[in-house]
Structures are given as structure tokens and as C-alpha cells.
Amino acid sequence: MSLKDKIRVIEDFPKKGISFKDITTLIADGEGLRDSVDQMAEFFKDKNIDVVVGPEARGFIFGVPVAYALGVGFIPVRKPGKLPGDTVRVEYDLEYGKDALEIHKDAIKPGMRVAIVDDLLATGGTIAAVAKLVEQAGGEVAGLAFTIELTELKGRDKLKGYEVTSLVDYDV
């Protein structure tokens, strides 16, 4: 059974016209979870990764085990006000407004090679902000890995200049 077969698709969620890709069925399946993590770790294995970064909340689900598989640490990227201590912040545009993400100021040392992991690549706005945050903190983005990519939304276009992989593609 493929990884795609282990992802539940729920139509009209969270609102009419949206085809929601539900990873809970994938991560509940031991083989599916292991295969996902193994494939992402394989993508990064020869990239001399120093640390894995993942945005909340579902980036944590895949980011932590990928970091474990690579033998490196994990750094969370959170919404403003969720991390204690000094942070570095980046703002980015949403369809209707702005949002922001933060990382601890001392989490990434200059020159660190960073793997970015998330569950889904859609429009690319959030993950482009994560990459900018990593670079603002002094890190070098060594690659980006996603469990799912919604190819019609052309998120890769916002990630030009980075090496990107996804495990499962959907038109939308």
C-alpha cells in the first residue's frame, strides 16, 4: 500500500470546496509513519545537516523523528508569543492579512545547515517564511521536505533556489 493510500481525503472540510488531506490516518499507521520519516531522512542524509526545523504544529510531527533519524536536534518554529526567551521574528502575507513566525534567537548558529520539514506544501507562503527565518538567524537552508504537496497551488514557485522534495503529490 502506498503512502497516498494511507492519507484520508475529506471533501468540503474545513469548508465547502476544500479537499482536506488528513495525515492522521498516515501517522496512525506504523509502517506509513516509518516510511514517511525514512524517505525524508534519506533525502537529507548526504546534506551534512546540523539541525531540523519544523513549523507548528504538524511540522513537529515529522520534523522530530526525521531529526532523530539523522542524529541531530530539532528546533520548533512557532506563532508569536509561544516561545520563552528572546526570539527572531518574520512576518509574511496571507491571503487576507499578515501572520508571523518566531524561533529562539540562539537556536541556530551562523553557518548551520538546516533541514526544514513540514507536512504540507500548498502555496509556499508559510514555508518561505520559515526559510527566511532560518536565514535571518544565520542558518543555511540545506533542503525542504514535505509529506504532501498540492501541486496545482504552485508552492515550489515561492521556493526557487532551494532543493525541495515531497512524498505524495495531489493536483488539489
Curated annotation (Swiss-Prot):
SUPFAM superfamilies in the cross-refs: PRTase-like
Pathway entry: Purine metabolism; AMP biosynthesis via salvage pathway; AMP from adenine: step 1/1
A GO term for molecular function: adenine phosphoribosyltransferase activity
Subcellular location as annotated: Cytoplasm
Listed GO biological process terms: adenine salvage; AMP salvage; purine ribonucleoside salvage
Catalyzed reactions per annotation: AMP + diphosphate = 5-phospho-alpha-D-ribose 1-diphosphate + adenine
Keyword Metal-binding: no
EC number: 2.4.2.7
CC annotations in GO: cytoplasm
Keywords (A to Z) from UniProt: Cytoplasm, Glycosyltransferase, Purine salvage, Transferase
Keyword set includes Glycosyltransferase: yes
Highest taxon of source: Bacteria
A Pfam family per the record: Pribosyltran
Family in the record: Belongs to the purine/pyrimidine phosphoribosyltransferase family.
HAMAP family: Aden_phosphoribosyltr
Function text: Catalyzes a salvage reaction resulting in the formation of AMP, that is energically less costly than de novo synthesis.
Subunit structure: Homodimer.
Name recorded for this polypeptide: Adenine phosphoribosyltransferase
Taxonomic lineage from the root: Bacteria, Bacillati, Bacillota, Clostridia, Eubacteriales
